[in-house]
Amino acid sequence: MDRIRIVGGNKLAGSIPISGAKNAALPLMIASLLTDDTLTLENVPHLADVEQLIRILGNHGVDYSVNGRREKQNEGYSRTINFSARNIVDTTAPYELVSKMRASFWVIGPLLARMGEAKVSLPGGCAIGTRPVDLFLEGLQALGADLDVDTGYVIAKTKNGRLVGNRYVFPKVSVGATHVLMMAASLAKGETVLENAACEPEIVNLAECLNAMGARISGAGTPTITIDGVESLSGARVRVIPDRIETGTYAMAVAMTGGDVVLEGARPELLQTALDVISQTGAEITQTNSGIRVKRNGAGISPVDVTTAPFPAFPTDLQAQFMGLMTMAKGKSRITETIFENRFMHVQELARLGAHITLSGQTAIVDGVAKLKGAPVMATDLRASVSLVIAGLAAEGETTVNRVYHLDRGFERLEEKLSNCGAVIERISA
């Protein structure tokens, strides 16, 4: 099993290209199931989750080509991929595929809307709390779907061959359920109004994609989304937005180690709250013609309290990284997690590097230390794993991060990007 070796203490300097957002690419890829024309997606990152979803879509009969050919492309970073779901051969998403990645459950919406039926295994992915799919199922039922859960599968069928538009109020904000219902309602009969919908930039990117395919969606990016269903959707060419989580992660790495880095292609409006918080820690963040410049000189790291919440607030997917940054702040900070109930699994691993962190319910109290010391650590999930990398970059001596397959799910060529900016970091194959 691969691991990453880091020798800390080096400032970062140079530029890092920001890849396409995984959390935007996955629903756009799934949207290809809604049409028998070709959907071309630009700026798709080369990640384990993307490759897994390609396999899942292939199981349904979706063909793909990367920049005009099927072979994987290793040069460059994000890619252009063509998806063709002209011939859906199977509406079942089996456990052995879905269990490896939670977002693959989302195929239930497009399959149900276009084919009138779907049988999808209950999902897997990062083991962060329970993350139930109740909202997905309630929403699809509101659109007229008949649902049954049997032996770990959700079996869904439409009445009279087509979903029917309706008003649905999400009991709590859910990005995944908003994605699924927006896709499903695009082919439903009549108007659907989604209230208390997620407002994340990835929702807006999906709405832009669906509208380019011929859907009639308004209000994406606000709590109320209106979808006027159409008979069919066509192909389109759409660009995946830059990854705001990757942007925030590298910005925090610079804030922690010091240095001066331009994050090429980053869009500040996608994570303004997080950038404001990073600025409060003492980093200088400015917009450039090509992205965002992050700079921190010799001044220490100031402690800042944060609470995770849905967009536009501080994102839960940056909580672990920010905790890594706060481990070396000059004073105490409080980090409160409101999205997931079990997202502090990185605390004990940061403690192995010398961090002082105590937990009180859903709040972590971080008492900053003058220095961290390298040690072997174990990644527990995607975002926790990169928080250990950030901490390792600033720690004295050598840090080894094990279970880096978590990193490969969400960060494109991370060690290469950091190494190009002066970090001493390498992947060691088992």
Swiss-Prot record:
Reactions catalysed, semicolon-separated, are: phosphoenolpyruvate + UDP-N-acetyl-alpha-D-glucosamine = UDP-N-acetyl-3-O-(1-carboxyvinyl)-alpha-D-glucosamine + phosphate
Kindly state which keywords UniProt assigns to this record, in alphabetical order: Cell cycle, Cell division, Cell shape, Cell wall biogenesis/degradation, Cytoplasm, Peptidoglycan synthesis, Pyruvate, Transferase
Q: What is its EC number?
A: 2.5.1.7
Q: Write out the catalytic residues in the record.
A: C126
UniProt keyword Chloroplast present: no
Q: Show the InterPro entries listed in the entry.
A: Enolpyruvate_Tfrase_dom (IPR001986), Enolpyruvate_Tfrase_sf (IPR036968), MurA_subfamily (IPR050068), RNA3'P_cycl/enolpyr_Trfase_a/b (IPR013792), UDP_GlcNAc_COvinyl_MurA (IPR005750)
Pathway linked to the protein: Cell wall biogenesis; peptidoglycan biosynthesis
Record family assignment: Belongs to the EPSP synthase family. MurA subfamily.
| Physiological role | Cell wall formation. Adds enolpyruvyl to UDP-N-acetylglucosamine.
List the protein's name. Answer: UDP-N-acetylglucosamine 1-carboxyvinyltransferase 1
